[in-house]
């Protein structure tokens, strides 16, 4: 199974949301300096949730791990998870894969969010051309502009939307890491009204 959607995932989503918003968030540059490992993503993220609270971290990571095991039939996996905030000043996201992991998941944590601010999954129409942009930094910077606001022509040439997943409070979305995907519209200006998700990265033990 490549994708799975579970509504009403957490038994106490309001408490988790309130607690998440109390945490310290970092941008990608700050995270790169803190962890001594280059990373690049829009908006702000917290530390790994297990470091924020071991009880919650253990509960939610175990739940997601069990679901992935049933989906894939694979035993033994590693999982990392963070809260992420993005707002209207973060522009438009870009279509990408998470090729360094086996599965990704995200949990929407905005009550009454506009459904159009969810996630789109894509088919890539020209993998060779898309991959060619990965060869150097200028190409990578170009990739980050392939969206519905900047390089629309190339966006429409390279990608066809396959699934549009609505942003629904307490909805968990799971998909394989090699699926092309993109966050849809960002919103808000403050912690309280920005797009809040909990993201998960899952890797099978070799």
Which residue stretches match the model-derived regions?
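Non-heme Fe(II)/2-oxoglutarate
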Residues: 1-85, 89-93, 118, 125, ...
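Catalytic core of non-heme Fe(II) oxygenases with the double-stranded beta-helix
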Residues: 88-206
């Amino acid at each position: 199974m490549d994708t799975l959607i579970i509504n009403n995932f957490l038994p106490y989503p309001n408490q988790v949301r309130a607690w998440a918003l109390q945490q310290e968030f970092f941008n990608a540059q700050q995270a790169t300096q803190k962890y001594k490992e280059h990373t690049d993503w829009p908006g702000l993220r917290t530390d790994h949730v297990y470091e924020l609270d071991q009880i919650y971290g253990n509960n939610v990571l175990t739940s997601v791990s069990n679901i992935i095991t049933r989906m894939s039939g694979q035993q033994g996996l590693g999982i990392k998870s963070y809260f992420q905030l993005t707002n209207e000043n973060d522009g438009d996201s870009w279509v990408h894969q998470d090729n360094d992991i086996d599965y990704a998941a995200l949990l929407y944590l905005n009550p009454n969010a506009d459904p159009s601010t969810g996630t789109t999954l894509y088919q890539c129409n020209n993998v060779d051309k898309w991959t060619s942009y990965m060869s150097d930094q200028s190409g990578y910077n170009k990739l980050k502009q392939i969206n519905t606001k900047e390089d629309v022509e190339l966006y429409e040439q390279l990608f066809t939307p396959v699934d549009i997943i609505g942003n629904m409070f307490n909805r968990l979305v799971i998909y394989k890491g090699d699926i092309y995907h993109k966050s849809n519209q960002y919103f808000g200006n403050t912690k309280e009204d920005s797009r809040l998700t909990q993201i998960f990265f899952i890797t099978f033990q070799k």
